[in-house]
């Protein structure tokens, strides 16, 4: 059956700021306390979406979350009106204010793990929300992510959206950023490659930075998504590269159809894994980048592998890269050699995503890949699909509500909270989402 990959991109939120919240993500740590530009960040993301949509790649949008997220501050013991809660936390524990104001939901590669209908036992598209248990600021995302996904994939006959796994370290799940699908045409059954960093009873794990994904979580997600057990491979990421800042697999590998583009040191027991994929995926092609050409450090600093590998109708592929790749002589030299070599990659497309990149999120972090048949695509909430009208409406919305300068101190401004809620109210109507945000269901929550 014919099917297409639709990229659902996260829209950057109004409180996008640099707080260094993500230990193990070296860009996040390095840019801590710098001044951010939320308006520019949102527009950079929108331009990527629209450019790819115009090039013929189906594209949709996932909206930001409510931030600062007052209900969690109340759980932490701060009381009074919303304004009083903000004032108290800013004075007594500003680190909590930064955490509950993170715009990290923009990186929707961590929102959920997807199983297309061609891979599932019941013939539905399955989406399991990620619990993002390893980082407090990200662990807050799952309930609203679930509401948003149910508002977008709202036809229960075609889509099953599953709640996140229990919030415990043993079941740490980071979503599609640790998941690849390999195979032929999108509508054919594919091989799902789940990548984990640690498992109970296995001493092979990183020592410097945390391994966020567990094998136990990956196995549970595969079950929830009803993936045919014959179409699943579990593989461990190389713990040494996690210790070099590869906090998700999509920082060191990206797949599309029959191609796996990865670093030579991406996986534990890599030659064994690639042999397994060759045996089980027709036409499988591994493009392994040697460490002698691109070091892990350079891969992390440029986000070479946090790229999007997109298929054209003629079978050729386009690699979507952040500008940092073009600015690095060694990486750009390698990429031009890659273009000349015998493989499906025939074009490099570069985007300026500096605002997201400075927090450790490249092109692949910003998108959730969902393979859909034509019938399934028609069943998606049409208001989220990118086109000229939506692009213009979202740009106008960003111009109206987003600030062009934000520091950590600004997060305590009650006006920022009010601006954010008004903006999301308008956006949820624009995207026909219903009341997906807690403040909408609580009537504002200003008392």
Swiss-Prot record:
Molecular function in Gene Ontology: N-succinylarginine dihydrolase activity
Keywords: Arginine metabolism, Hydrolase
Pfam families: AstB
Active-site residues annotated for this sequence: 174, 248, 365 (nucleophile)
Binding site for substrate: 19-28, 110, 137-138, 212, 250, 359
UniProt entry tagged with the keyword Hydrolase: yes
Pathway entry: Amino-acid degradation; L-arginine degradation via AST pathway; L-glutamate and succinate from L-arginine: step 2/5
Entry's Gene Ontology BP terms: arginine catabolic process to glutamate; arginine catabolic process to succinate
Record EC number: 3.5.3.23
Enzyme class: hydrolase
InterPro entries: AstB_sf (IPR037031), SuccinylArg_d-Hdrlase_AstB (IPR007079)
RNA-binding recorded as keyword: no
Subunit text: Homodimer.
Family the entry assigns: Belongs to the succinylarginine dihydrolase family.
HAMAP family per UniProt: AstB
Record function comment: Catalyzes the hydrolysis of N(2)-succinylarginine into N(2)-succinylornithine, ammonia and CO(2).
Name of this chain's protein: N-succinylarginine dihydrolase
Classification of source organism: Bacteria, Pseudomonadati, Pseudomonadota, Gammaproteobacteria, Enterobacterales
């Amino acid at each position: 059956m014919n099917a297409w990959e639709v990229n659902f991109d996260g829209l950057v939120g109004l409180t996008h700021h640099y707080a260094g919240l993500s230990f193990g993500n070296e860009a996040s740590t390095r840019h801590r306390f710098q001044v951010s530009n939320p308006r520019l960040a949102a527009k950079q993301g929108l331009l990527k979406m629209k450019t790819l949509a115009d090039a013929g790649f189906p594209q949709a949008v996932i909206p930001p979350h409510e931030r600062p997220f007052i209900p969690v501050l109340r759980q932490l013991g701060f009381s009074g009106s919303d304004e009083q809660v903000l004032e108290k936390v800013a004075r007594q524990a500003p680190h909590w204010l930064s955490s509950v104001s993170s715009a990290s939901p923009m990186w929707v590669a961590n929102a959920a793990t997807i199983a297309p209908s061609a891979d599932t036992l019941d013939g539905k598209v399955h989406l399991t929300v990620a619990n993002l248990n390893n980082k407090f600021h990200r662990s807050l995302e799952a309930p609203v992510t679930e509401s948003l996904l149910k508002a977008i994939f709202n036809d229960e006959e075609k889509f099953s959206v599953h709640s996140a796994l229990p919030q415990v370290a043993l079941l740490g799940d980071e979503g599609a950023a640790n998941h690849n699908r390999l195979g032929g045409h999108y509508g054919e059954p594919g091989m799902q490659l789940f990548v984990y960093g640690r498992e109970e009873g296995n001493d092979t794990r990183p020592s410097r930075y945390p391994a966020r994904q567990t094998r136990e979580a990956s196995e549970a997600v595969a079950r929830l998504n009803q993936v045919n057990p014959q179409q699943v491979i579990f593989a461990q990421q190389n713990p040494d590269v996690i210790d070099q800042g590869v906090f998700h697999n999509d920082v060191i590998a990206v797949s599309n159809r029959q191609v796996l583009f990865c670093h030579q040191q991406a996986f534990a027991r890599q030659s064994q894994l690639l042999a397994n994929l060759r045996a089980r995926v027709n036409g499988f092609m591994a493009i392994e980048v040697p460490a002698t050409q691109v070091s892990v450090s350079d891969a992390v600093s440029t986000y070479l592998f946090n790229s999007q590998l997109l298929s054209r109708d003629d079978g050729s592929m386009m690699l979507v890269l952040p500008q940092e790749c073009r600015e690095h002589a060694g990486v750009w030299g390698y990429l031009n050699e890659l273009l000349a070599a015998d493989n499906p990659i025939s074009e490099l497309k570069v985007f300026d995503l500096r605002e997201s990149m400075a927090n450790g999120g490249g092109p692949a972090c910003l998108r959730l890949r969902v393979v859909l048949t034509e019938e399934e695509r028609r069943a998606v909430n049409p208001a989220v699909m990118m086109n000229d009208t939506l692009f213009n409406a979202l740009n106008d919305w960003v111009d109206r509500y987003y600030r062009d300068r934000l520091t950590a101190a600004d997060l305590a401004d009650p006006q920022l909270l009010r601006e954010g809620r008004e903006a999301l109210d308008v956006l949820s109507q624009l995207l026909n989402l219903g009341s997906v945000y807690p403040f909408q269901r609580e009537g504002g929550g200003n008392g």
